[in-house]
Amino acid sequence: MISQINNKGRDNKLEAYDYFLDPSLIASKPCAIRHESRLMIVRNSVLEENCLTNKFTKNLLDEFRKGDLLVVNNTKVMKARLKVQLENRTLVELLVLERSHECVWLCLAKPAKKLKINRKIILKSPYAQDINLMVDGVDEETGGRFIKFPENITDLNSMNDLLNKYGEIPLPPYIKNSEEESFHEKSYQTEYATNPGAVAAPTAGLHLSKSLISNLKKKGVIILPITLHVGYGTFKPIDQEDLSNLKLHKEWVSVNEEVVEEIKRIKKTDRKIIAIGTTSVRALESCYSHEINDYVPIAKYVDLVIKPGYKFKVVDGLLTNFHLPKSSLLLLVSAMIGRERLLDLYKKAIKEKFRFFSYGDAMYISPDSLLEKK
């Protein structure tokens, strides 16, 4: 196990998580075959030869043993981007985040200044009738707007039905290409996405093809789902330099009894628990109860912050993407292997032309490389 450098002061400064990335390395489309994306494997030494960069996601099959547990996030990205029209025909874009109360939903708006309280707006689609909405309030935390939808839009199922008629897949702004909407409807979902509720994809899962999943199961690797509906807490830019009291926007998490019992069983063996993506890490770590010192099923909103110094209670390893500078995701991965080492690995990835962000390549952090454990 690597000894952690005592650099707590720097670890709590946002600027310490910055790095330069040539825009040409930002992936605008996914790898044609999911499991053919490139893979950086991080081992238990800072020696360069223990960072493997000549692998592909399909080589994950060689990294896991029979009885290891892979935990995937089965959330499904909703068509959460809506285009609405004001009375003067001005267009405004909404991103539906979550239900506030009754038929009122929190949305990010662009440009938000156009949406004053009590202003009426019209949701339009060439395939369905117009729907009248109203601005019900302003959210101080996000700068978003509380939007009043029709009275029957009171849960995720009814909202998802509406979004399927009027909405678009909410791709990150750095994904710019000419692909049709139908292309992203498939490519920006994991193969196991079954639970609508996310406004961004759990992108590490995009690397797992049906054939790779099948081969992992044939090997005896256990694959179980949790749910974290990826929302504002995952992609919101951090706007404070001092990270010592960082808070994240809450996101809905569900970890069921089957997963918890499997965690308890595996913790008594030499097998490992591998999270597919940072959202799976946050969900799994949230199911550990400090009050009773045990793992418990959960179905609730969580706002867990994982940054350097955090001691992992559940997760042993991680498959993840290459993340944006100064992001909460970069903090989480830094908590696993150390900020300085992670940034050194990013420099290596940039030098070797790895593809970054949502549609980019992957990094696998092996269990023996984690810094902090319970």
Swiss-Prot record:
Pathway: tRNA modification; tRNA-queuosine biosynthesis
Catalytic activity: 7-aminomethyl-7-carbaguanosine(34) in tRNA + S-adenosyl-L-methionine = epoxyqueuosine(34) in tRNA + adenine + L-methionine + 2 H(+)
Main location: cytoplasm
UniProt EC number: 2.4.99.17
Transmembrane regions listed in the UniProt entry: none
Compartment(s) of residence: Cytoplasm
Family: Belongs to the QueA family.
Name of protein: S-adenosylmethionine:tRNA ribosyltransferase-isomerase
Source organism of the structure: Prochlorococcus marinus (strain MIT 9215)
